[in-house]
Amino acid sequence: MWKISNENDIFKKRKPLPPKKSEESQPELTPWQKQNQEYLKKQAEEAASKGENEQAEVTITLQEQSQEEPQQHLPQETVEEEEHFADRLPNVKKTRNKRLYRRLAFILTCLGTAILVALYFVSPLSRLSEVTVSGNKSVESQAIIQQSKLETGSGLWEQYSNRNYFSANIQKKFPIIKKANIKLNGINSFKIDIQEYQIVALAATKGGYHPILENGKTLAETTKAAESGKPIFENFKEDKLIPELMASYNKLPQEIKQGISEIKYAPSKTNKDLINVYMNDGNRVIVNISDLSEKMAYYSQVAEQMDKPGIVDMEVGIFSYPYEKESEETGSEVSEDSAVENQEVVDPNAGVATDEANNGTPTNGENQEVQQAE
């Protein structure tokens, strides 16, 4: 037989049943609503002391208010957030579409560029079609194109990237060319701009006249006739002398250059740097190559003080004298030299001497004795 325990023990051991869940779950309350409910509960507890009837009425009223107020008293921030999010939905879609369009445009641009570049290098436009020359005066255009080693029909950009090499070929072959600038001319053609050295003088040789450039180089080509207006350099057999002379000559004023007709190399025993500069006004200037640019600056002042053409000596100082004085000095020197050379040399072994005054008639010792007796 089972022993029935006390009713109180049975009720103590029985666990309380969990509250039944409402079919419709209530929305989560905000902190404001929770405080409101706590406030209502306090009022309900106070009203309970006054009477059950009043408590019931107050409870019913408060419950109705609590059910109506959650929607009426929602925080303004939550409502605004929902409104802002709804407003941003179209903007988000537009932003995404713009990004997609940009990426698509970038990809299409890259593909289109690659296709165009490939088509360009396959087409004849990427090959050199023509070469023209401008600025050349002394060298023919066809000779310049030929010596440049540029090839029509070959790659345009490959040759353009190596344009310095082709310019060097031209300058190496033609010393008169100072610069050869290769640049694009149109879609697939080149233009060579030539800048030449000026021919400032002529070097006189047995075969003719060689042009002398402003940088001191002497060209190998010869001309039979001298070009008017260009000074003539004579007796410059050493190659290094002309570049030294041109370094000083280029520093002269233009009016002095125009007044020079000829320059001769005239070294002395003691001075290997001496030259004679012949002027168009008839004067002759004696000066060192190294002093040419410095001392020739005073030539105009000295020439104005001269009464007639003569010599301007600038070897040591600066002074002038007429040609007659030089001829007298030269004549005296020549007479002294001729007297020394014409002295009779008697050979003791020679018995006969030739007298030019007697047309080669021999003179013996008997004639000498007759002359002595007379």
UniProtKB/Swiss-Prot annotation:
GO terms for biological process: FtsZ-dependent cytokinesis. Residues 125-374 are extracellular. This is Cell division protein DivIB. Residues 39-53 have a biased composition (Basic and acidic residues). GO terms for cellular component: cell division site; plasma membrane. Residues 1-90, 325-374 are annotated as: Disordered. It comes from the Bacteria. Belongs to the FtsQ/DivIB family. DivIB subfamily. The keyword Membrane applies. Cell division protein that may be involved in stabilizing or promoting the assembly of the division complex. It is found in: Cell membrane. Its main location: membrane. It holds the Pfam family POTRA_1. Residues 56-75, 356-374 have a biased composition (Polar residues). It comes from Enterococcus faecalis (strain ATCC 700802 / V583). The chain crosses the membrane at residues 104-124. Residues 126-197 form the POTRA domain. Residues 1-103 are cytoplasmic. The keyword DNA-binding does not apply. It is a single-pass type II membrane protein. InterPro entries: Cell_div_FtsQ/DivIB_C, DivIB, FtsQ_DivIB, POTRA, POTRA_FtsQ_type. Keywords: Cell cycle, Cell division, Cell membrane, Membrane, Transmembrane, Transmembrane helix. Residues 326-339 have a biased composition (Acidic residues).
